[in-house]
């Protein structure tokens, strides 16, 4: 027999007893102003991850806090971050970045919701390198092949992530249109100091096997719009625009379609004949290349690409804009187009961020 021991506790309101295994994970509710849509969020997931998990369509781009595509108005509640996302200061007071923000309370946010077709599933897939074409001194075109009898479902303008062996990811826009799905086409620019792009340019061989996650992103063509469309690209920002324009042709979208492609010099127009061919074949399409550091024999448009757009269309209130390229170009273009009367709901953009291999940013 063991002796009976009576233990008494004196508990007051200042006493807290906890055990790690007994603690519950905190959860909150996020409400989208206007639509009233709500979703739950756990304390260990970002606002964007919680939304995607529950098929709530929030806009996003880089997913690393740099491009600002996901920016939302924070109407009530508290959002915390692990570090300071680079774009947080740029988006201004009263805003949050759902791709990096964690809920510290119930939230009410103001954001443009986007369509999330549930039938298009994000998948982890193996791919085989079918072709590596060096288009210019610093751009290659990759063609990737999925396993036999498989096709990737996606919307024009989305991107994929390469999943590297060390756990890092590298993001690249899909350059082909959804109807043309025998191969996945990517346009990859060499990044100084980027180990992945060094490998792509110097060592990647046909038949190499890689792993991808796709499709990702909300930079997609809105095929139900009848407004004239402006596509503005910088460098390899042409890649997602190519897929969107080809899809627009396939869908017989009859409104005017204008492509402005900004690069430094003429050699940086890495597929110069393709948009010229589109202009010959489609009466509603125009192509305007713009050089910021023009060659001596260049007789076309010069300067910044967004300035060329505004020179041709000073009033953008009746247009849709699709814009992809480096963050400075996207930032300048967005501000200029808003000032020219373009409604924010008509503006779609994808801001490319180039990684060094010291961090987790994509070699887009």
Residue ranges: model-predicted function:
Residues 75-78, 112-114, 165, 215:
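Short, surface-exposed secondary-structure boundary micro-motifs
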Residues 157, 237, 326:
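Short, conserved phosphate/pyrophosphate- and ester-handling motifs at nucleotide-, phospho-/glycolipid
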Residues 215-225:
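A short, basic/flexible loop-to-alpha-helix module at the beginning of a structural domain
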Residues 121-209, 226-227, 263-265, 290-294:
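Ferredoxin-reductase
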Residues 22-107, 256-364:
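Reductase modules of NAD(P)H-dependent flavoproteins
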């Amino acid at each position: 027999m063991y002796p009976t021991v009576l233990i008494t506790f004196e508990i007051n309101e200042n006493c807290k007893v906890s055990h790690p295994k007994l603690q519950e994970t905190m959860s909150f509710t996020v409400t989208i102003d206007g639509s009233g849509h709500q979703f739950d969020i756990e304390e260990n997931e970002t606002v964007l991850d919680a939304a995607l998990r529950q098929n709530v369509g929030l806009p996003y781009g880089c997913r690393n806090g740099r491009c600002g595509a996901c920016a939302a108005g924070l109407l009530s509640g508290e959002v915390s971050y692990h570090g300071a996302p680079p774009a947080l200061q740029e988006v201004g007071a009263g805003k949050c970045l759902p791709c990096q923000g964690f809920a510290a309370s119930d939230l009410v946010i103001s954001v443009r919701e986007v369509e999330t077709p549930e039938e298009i599933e994000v998948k982890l897939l193996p791919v085989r390198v079918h072709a590596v074409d060096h288009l210019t001194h610093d751009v290659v075109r990759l063609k990737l092949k999925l396993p036999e009898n498989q096709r990737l479902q996606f919307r024009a303008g989305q991107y994929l992530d390469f999943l590297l062996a060390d756990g890092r990811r590298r993001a690249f826009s899909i350059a082909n249109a959804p109807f043309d799905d025998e191969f996945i086409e990517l346009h990859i620019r060499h990044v100084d100091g980027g180990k992945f792009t060094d490998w792509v340019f110097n060592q990647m061989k046909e038949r190499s096997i890689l792993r991808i996650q796709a499709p990702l992103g909300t930079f997609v063509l809105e095929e139900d719009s009848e407004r004239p469309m402006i596509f503005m690209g910088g460098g390899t920002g042409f890649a997602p625009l190519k897929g969107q324009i080809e899809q627009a042709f396939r869908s017989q979208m009859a409104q005017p379609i204008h492509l402005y492609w900004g690069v430094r010099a003429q050699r940086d127009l890495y597929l110069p004949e393709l948009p010229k061919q589109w202009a010959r074949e489609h009466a509603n399409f125009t192509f305007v290349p713009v050089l910021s550091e023009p060659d001596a024999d260049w007789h076309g448009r010069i300067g910044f690409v967004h300035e060329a757009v505004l020179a041709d269309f000073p009033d953008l209130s009746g247009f849709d804009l699709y814009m992809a390229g480096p963050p400075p170009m996207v930032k300048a273009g967005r501000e200029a187009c808003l000032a020219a009367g373009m409604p924010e709901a008509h503006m779609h953009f994808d801001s490319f961020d180039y990684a060094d291999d010291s961090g987790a940013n994509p070699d887009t």
